Amino acid sequence: ENLQTVSYSDLWSKIQMTGKALSVLEKPENPPIIGLLTYNQLNGVLVDLACLSFGFRVIPIPLNSTNEHLSFILKQSKVTHLFVGGKTAIRLWNDVQPSHTISVIAFNNPNLIHGNVTEWNTFFDNRDRAQNFNVNQRMSYVSVDSTQTIMYTSGSTANPKGITFTQKNLISKRFARALALPEFGSDDTFLCYLPLFHTFGRYFELMGSIFWGATYSFAESPAFNSLLKDFLMVNPTIFISIPKRWVQLYEMLEEQLDLDSDDSDII
């Protein structure tokens, strides 16, 4: 029930350290391509933001992928290093592992993961081996027009389709969203459960929070009752959701309140 908080200053420090650790994976003429197969968690965000900050191509992979689609994504995007977190991700990877020669970094339970596995703390501690990692220089080298990240559709009708994004795409999306929602700002608190492998969760909630200087709060679970508890702890001003959750909220409130009342105090 304890809330753990991270300031923007601490976040940027952790992103830089993660970038250093990622740079250790580099080989001459063979930059690492990073895959993310995980539930929403801080360490996954650190990897994603470090990749975007320092020019490592990163591919968030839907957790609802089939084995066939996961293999397709890994092969098409040429992932060299896959960060894996959570039971669903571990099961998916273990099922396809024999078909791939990919290095795995385990966010948790490395002993349950098949293949060439490095534990997160080992990966993170390797940042001390980074050579010539100058933060400002690395950022200045990042191309605004090269493919920076690929996001895949669910592949419900055929193989998943990869949508490529450059840094310029990410920036233009960010400013367009901000122009459409000028009321959002640094006083806002997001409660977020939408997956970070989808555009709304990743671009609107996560990167939007950073752009606005708002507070991004990880929901403990997407389950309705769990979200209700998170509402009480976090007191969000912004909550983005699928229609089903709004219907559930309305029905719950309708049971407890007279929503047709003219008395605003009742509501």
Residue ranges with predicted function:
Residues K87-V144, L253-I267:
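ANL superfamily adenylate-forming
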Residues T38-Y39, F56-K75, G86-A89, Y216-V234, ...:
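ATP-dependent adenylate-forming carboxylate-activation enzymes
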Residues W12-M17, A130, V144, I163-E183:
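Conserved structural elements of the adenylate-forming
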Residues I171-T189, L196-I267:
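Conserved AMP-binding/adenylation subdomain of ANL enzymes
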Residues T5-S9, Y141, Q148-R174:
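Conserved AMP-binding A3 loop
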Residues L3-T5, G19-S65, Y193:
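Conserved AMP-binding/adenylate-forming
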Residues D48-F54, Q76, M207-F211, Y250:
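Short hydrophobic alpha-helices that are characteristic scaffold elements of the AMP-binding
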Residues D128-Y152, N159, E183-T189:
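Conserved pre-ATP/AMP-binding loop-to-beta segment of ANL
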